[in-house]
Design a protein with these regions (language model features):
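Cationic, low-complexity basic patches in intrinsically disordered or flexible, solvent-exposed regions
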Residues: 58, 67, 133
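Glycine-biased, low-complexity coil/linker segments
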Residues: 59-63, 71-72, 144
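Intrinsically disordered, low-complexity segments enriched in serine/threonine/proline/glycine
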Residues: 55, 67-69, 77, 139, ...
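Conserved NTP-donor binding/palm subdomain of two-metal-ion nucleotidyltransferases/polymerases, i.e.
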Residues: 1-52, 78-137, 149-154, 159-409
């Protein structure tokens, strides 16, 4: 890892409360790089929280333009004024967006339930609710806010009980359904927010592993349909139905792996998983550890999970990583540094869902380019799944034919 990468990780750690201060005072150029990295990884709001001990001060000599002074517990760090206000503006927009999506999640679930569909919200706002570490000494809003309000939200992913045909028929009552795949469909519920109706929580392309995964989801379904969690909104108390921690531990590791060997995965997904693991170990007291380890073993993802555990420890909580290495029985999987560094290098290159990965810039222009790009990754990362090189292209061909037979685009 480069020095700027390590400084970026320190900024994240300060934001989430696992570090007191940065190891050195960033220069104006370094602050610019940190902001660019936060943008690339979709962590703009969370990283801004790392600087929430700010107070206006005169610019020190040699810094050039007027700056704002950040006082950490052990040091001072300067950030250029224009960059600060740009960053703060992004953070405020993220807060406002989260407030909107929180209300939309509640509204959507009320409608689905009234129409006879048991459901639960996956990822997104359900993950944000686990961001329990508060921002110290104020926030981007005058009333203060926890990190959950600063997590960059995307679309709304909601699982509906009933299977493809029933869910699709219902989705069409909202308007034209333009995209249907093996998991989900895009439904025009809200004009400003993409909503995905899932008729499966997720899949694996290996049919034998997928059978085991679907069995796990089915076993967890009753608990998920009744698992009520609270969302943070300024002036109102909001609740949604969301997956259990055991469900999240399996579902999100499979989700991370899928995006890792396709377009790419970013640190936002790893931060989500960090808070899922933190909740399991600190709140649930490890009650699901043995069950989750068994399922991940059955899915053949133990080695990948060990890489993920190393990454979330190294990036988000180095102190906890040291404990996990010394006492591997206290965590889900023993951290694997060699594989973890490989995974982290890919994460830093690809960014959030690979949107800034120069290696993948042509995959949206050609299905064949996308096909070969993904298949080449299954060979490169053979260590994590010895049969992905076979099942990935087989599944993609099958899925293409399935969509054509169903009349889906």
């Amino acid at each position: 890892m480069t020095d700027i990468n390590n400084l970026f990780f320190e900024l994240i750690q300060v934001a989430i409360g696992t570090r007191i201060c940065l190891s050195h005072t960033p220069s104006a150029d370094e602050w610019g790089e940190l902001y660019a990295m936060a943008m690339k990884q979709s962590l703009v709001g969370v990283c801004f929280a790392g600087g929430q001990k700010a107070s206006p001060q005169p610019s020190p000599e040699g810094m050039g333009e007027k700056s704002l002074l950040f006082r950490g517990d052990l040091e001072e760090a300067y950030i250029p004024e224009m960059l600060y206000f740009t960053w703060m503006g992004m953070a405020v927009k993220i807060q406002q967006r989260n407030e909107t999506i929180n209300r939309q999640c509640v509204e959507l679930q009320k409608r689905l339930s009234a129409d006879g569909f048991r459901n639960y919200i996956m990822k997104g706002q359900a993950n944000a609710a686990l961001y329990q570490c508060g921002v110290k000494n104020g926030s981007v809003s005058s009333k203060g806010s926890s990190l959950s309000a600063l997590r960059q939200s995307g679309d709304i992913d909601v699982y509906l009980e009933g299977g493809l045909d029933r869910v699709l028929a219902y989705a069409r009552t909202f308007g034209e359904v333009k995209k249907v795949n093996e998991l989900e469909m895009s439904v025009p519920v809200f004009s400003e927010t993409v909503v995905e109706f899932h008729y499966r929580p997720f899949i694996m392309r290996n049919p034998f592993k997928n059978r085991r995964l679907q069995a796990f989801f089915q076993d967890q379904s009753e608990a998920c349909f009744t698992n009520r969690i609270s969302l943070e909104n300024k002036a109102e108390s909001l609740e949604i139905m969301a997956p259990t921690i055991a469900f999240n531990l399996v579902h999100q590791i499979v989700h991370i792996y899928h995006h890792f060997i396709t377009e790419g995965v970013g640190l936002r997904q790893l931060m989500d998983y960090h808070f899922v693991v933190k909740h399991e170990m600190e709140v649930e007291k490890g009650s699901s550890v043995q069950e989750v380890k068994k399922v991940i073993s059955d899915l053949g993802l133990e080695r990948f999970a060990s890489a993920v555990i190393w990454v979330i420890g190294y990036v988000f909580d180095p102190g906890m990583l040291a404990t996990w290495i010394q006492k591997s029985e206290t965590t889900l999987w023993k951290p694997n540094e060699k594989d973890g560094r490989l995974l982290l290098d890919e994460i830093m290159m690809s960014g959030n869902f690979g949107h800034t990965d120069e290696r993948a810039k042509d995959i949206l222009t050609s299905r064949w380019k996308a096909f070969w790009f993904v298949n080449s990754k299954t060979f490169r990362f053979w260590r994590f799944d010895h049969w992905a090189w076979f099942w990935s292209p087989v599944w993609r061909v099958y899925h293409f034919l399935w969509r054509k037979m169903k009349g889906f685009k």
